[in-house]
């Protein structure tokens, strides 16, 4: 699978990937998302923090979209807020699952988050099937 579009041309006013990353993060309007935080206990005795964006009125049968933030990201990252706004506009329930110690609260166990660990991701997805 190709990782780039070979005929992509950056706009003349925004050449290069760095500007294309910074401009949306710093200068684009951000939706006002009201999250409901949930502290979810993990099977190993630790916890994760989940920030839910749920439309009102909430439909318990609406799809759940799970978002895993990027490195040093959170539910307040511009891309997470945009995605959660798109979810609620469609009537879906969205959740940003913060990796261990990434939600503003240090975890109980010495196990830390790292990008290569998919066990927590799998557990989150399986657990969200119950919601």
Cite the ranges covered by each PLM segment.
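Conserved alpha/beta-hydrolase
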Residues: 76, 84-108
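An amphipathic, basic-hydrophobic helix/alpha-beta surface used to engage anionic
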Residues: 81
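N-terminal cap/lid segment of alpha/beta-hydrolase-fold proteins
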Residues: 19-58
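Glycine-rich phosphate-binding loop signature in dinucleotide/nucleotide-binding domains
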Residues: 59-60, 131
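Catalytic nucleophile-loop/oxyanion-hole region of alpha/beta-hydrolase
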Residues: 86, 102-131
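Short beta-strand element of the alpha/beta-hydrolase
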Residues: 61-70
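N-terminal presequences and immediately downstream first alpha-helices
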Residues: 1-28
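Short strand->helix junction
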Residues: 72-74
């Amino acid at each position: 699978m190709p990782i780039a579009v070979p005929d992509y041309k950056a706009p003349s006013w925004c050449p290069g990937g760095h500007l294309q990353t910074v401009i949306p993060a710093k200068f684009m309007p951000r939706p006002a998302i009201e999250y409901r935080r949930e502290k979810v206990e993990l099977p190993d005795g630790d916890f994760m923090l989940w920030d839910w964006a749920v439309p009102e009125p909430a439909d318990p049968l609406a799809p759940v979209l799970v978002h895993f933030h990027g490195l040093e990201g959170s539910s307040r990252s511009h891309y997470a807020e945009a995605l959660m706004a798109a979810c609620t506009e469609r009537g879906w329930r969205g959740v940003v699952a913060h990796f261990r110690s990434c939600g503003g609260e240090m975890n109980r166990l010495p196990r830390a988050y790292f990008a290569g660990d998919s066990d927590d991701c799998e557990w989150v997805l399986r657990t969200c099937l119950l919601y």
